[in-house]
């Protein structure tokens, strides 16, 4: 069943190159399997939630899908997932994600916490840098500088609505590290998640330090030292 669902998700997400494609989902699945091996949690529920956590993402499928979890519910029903398991998977998906965390909504079950950790881990470290850059480059066609503007500083206390707002002035590649990515280390639930997040966090800090050095931005290095 898992392999069949993987193939369906791969087809559904085909062509998405902004950091939320199947490659991201596959990494979240593998990270989830690694974390669940260290915890006493339901492996099937963790696996399903990991594979389906982005198939109704509001950035890709709109707010209506995100609220109803249309694709996740359909895929589970088509593959014979029982009602109780499907409900637990949907509860996990409904309670994870950074925009929800800004509202204080976090997963309450161990299974949900494992998938949340895996999802946030893939947002940081080397893969996180690549995903964030890919998303920024996708948006560069608008004519705005989506990479870095040394005169536009991050907004550190965004509400969910502000965070999701398109074309927000501070929303560029470098500022995204400060507005989200550097905060994720402290949002881990599991022991394994915290250990891996620490490694990936240090990589991002090193990347930013070198970026600011090469671009002769000592004021940004000072800012980073206050935030890291």
Give the role of each language-model region.
Residues 22, 26-29, 47, 86-94:
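Short, well-structured alpha-helical segments
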Residues 4-15:
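Generic N-terminal amphipathic, Lys/Arg-enriched alpha-helix
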Residues 82-116:
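Hydrophobic, well-structured mid-protein blocks that either form specific transmembrane helices
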Residues 13-22, 26, 30-39, 52, ...:
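Divalent metal-dependent phosphate-bond-processing catalytic cores, especially two-metal-ion Mg2+/Mn2+ enzymes
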Residues 2-6, 22-25:
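Onset of an N-terminal alpha helix
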Residues 28, 66-78:
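An active-site-proximal "capping" alpha-helix that borders the catalytic cofactor pocket
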Residues 43-61, 68, 90-99:
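His-Asp-centered metal-binding catalytic motifs of divalent-metal-dependent phosphohydrolases/nucleases
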Residues 41-43, 85:
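Membrane-helix interface segments
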